[in-house]
């Protein structure tokens, strides 16, 4: 049985030089070391594409973060709505492998009807509602 996993990351996880991406990068490395075939999806805003990730993953896709006023006016939180990409959805639909959404940031397609038959896992990085509550003060 082939072990394959989609990982949707809120940022490019290499170099592993700050909290959230450290966790994502070393998770990818550990899973790859165990023979899991990883299809990595990264939202990109300021961090360049990384060849090192291509050595660990079967495929690596990069998507722009959609910043601007229209993303800010959504009913969905900005950190989620600005990370929406129809290309991501298309790539997720190419197979039936499980999907790991890294952080609430990446969950725009979590409840999409086309993914209803898929195993979908959300790994919360922080207690997000408390984190943003205190940032707002």
List the predicted regions and their residue ranges.
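N-terminal subdomain of nucleotide-sugar transferases
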Residues: 1-60, 96
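Glycine-rich nucleotide phosphate-binding loop and flanking beta-alpha elements
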Residues: 14, 105-108, 128
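Short, well-ordered alpha-helical microsegments
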Residues: 47-50, 106-111
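Active-site regions of enzymes building and remodeling cell-envelope glycoconjugates
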Residues: 53-64, 117-121
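Acceptor-binding helix/loop patch of EC 2.4 sugar-transfer enzymes
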Residues: 67-76, 120-137
């Amino acid at each position: 049985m082939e072990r394959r996993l989609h990982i949707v990351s809120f940022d490019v996880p290499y170099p592993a030089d700050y909290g959230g991406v450290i966790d994502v990068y070393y998770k990818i490395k550990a899973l790859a070391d165990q023979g899991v075939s990883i299809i990595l999806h990264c939202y990109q805003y300021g961090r360049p594409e990384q060849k090192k990730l291509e050595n660990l993953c079967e495929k690596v896709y990069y998507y722009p973060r959609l910043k601007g006023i229209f993303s800010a006016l959504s009913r969905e939180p900005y950190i989620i709505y600005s990370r929406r990409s129809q290309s991501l959805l298309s790539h997720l639909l190419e197979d039936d492998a499980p999907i790991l959404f890294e952080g609430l940031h990446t969950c725009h397609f979590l409840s999409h009807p086309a993914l209803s038959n898929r195993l979908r896992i959300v790994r919360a990085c922080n207690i997000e509602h408390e984190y943003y509550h205190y940032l707002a003060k």
